[in-house]
């Protein structure tokens, strides 16, 4: 069987999304580990897990596992179901071979320019997680807080003046490049308390690589066509 090494999903896609696993083909020898818990996801069940925690898969069987996975942000109805899951009875849903005609998929997954409020939320969550780690250097922690809040403030200034205007993209790039140049060489100069991930890779994936997506501009015009 194949193994999935321990890792954390920390790129931008996972800031607001979770993944539902529906095992189609599996074996009792397949175990999924998340944090300090482990479980066998049986065929036909539906599972949700916290991808911010360290997780891995161990397949000691000769069976290749096949899962249907669905990534979504989720409506209030979805999250209400998640909250109440332990109190609800399991429902067996019979297979229906009829074509699905009303399957809804995301059409606007990423904005051309990250909204300042979203950037601030990501920054504050990451800083709080690192500040909760007593092993981090307080002076470096202070420097990173100033660096990331400077990024947010300058980003908000350009956003307030120009929004999605392509004429402002050079200014946005300059802000991102300046921030990237001031990151410490050590990717683990600060480490999160919750899952022991270095701060730099998270900054790179959740902010610097995600904050400016010029090719998405057309999608936000009245005649826009979503990109693949």
Task: Identify the residue ranges that each predicted region occupies.
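A short hydrophobic beta-strand segment most commonly corresponding to one strand
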Residues: 17-23, 46-48, 62-80
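Short, structured patches in soluble enzyme cores that scaffold and shape functional sites
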Residues: 24-26, 34-36, 51, 59, ...
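Short beta-strand His + acidic residue motifs that chelate non-heme Fe in jelly-roll/DSBH
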Residues: 4-7, 30-32, 49-50, 54-61
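C-terminal non-catalytic accessory extensions
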Residues: 156-228
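A short beta-strand-loop-beta hairpin characteristic of the jelly-roll/cupin
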Residues: 5, 23-43
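Extended amphipathic alpha-helical scaffold segments
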Residues: 121-170, 174-177
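Conserved double-stranded beta-helix
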Residues: 1-24
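Charged, amphipathic alpha-helical linkers/stalks
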Residues: 69-138
């Amino acid at each position: 069987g194949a193994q999935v090494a321990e890792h954390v999903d920390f790129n931008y896609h996972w800031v607001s999304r979770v993944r539902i696993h529906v095992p189609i083909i599996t074996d009792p020898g397949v175990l999924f580990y998340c944090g300090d818990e482990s479980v066998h996801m049986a065929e036909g069940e539906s599972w949700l897990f916290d991808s911010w925690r360290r997780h891995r898969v161990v397949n000691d069987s000769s069976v290749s596992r096949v899962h249907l996975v669905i990534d979504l942000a989720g409506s209030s109805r979805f999250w209400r179901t998640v909250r109440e899951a332990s109190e609800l009875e399991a429902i067996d849903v019979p297979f229906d071979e009829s074509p699905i005609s009303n399957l809804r998929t995301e059409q606007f997954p990423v904005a051309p320019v990250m909204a300042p409020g979203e950037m601030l939320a990501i920054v504050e969550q990451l800083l709080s997680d690192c500040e909760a780690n007593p092993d981090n250097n307080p002076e470096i922690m202070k420097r990173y807080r100033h660096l990331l809040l400077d990024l947010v403030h300058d980003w908000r200034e350009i956003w307030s003046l120009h929004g999605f205007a392509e004429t402002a993209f050079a200014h946005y790039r300059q802000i991102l490049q300046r921030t990237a140049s001031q990151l410490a060489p050590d990717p683990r100069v600060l480490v999160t308390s919750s899952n022991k991930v270095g701060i730099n890779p998270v900054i790179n994936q959740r902010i610097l690589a995600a904050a400016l997506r010029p090719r998405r501009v057309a999608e936000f015009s009245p005649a826009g066509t979503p990109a693949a």
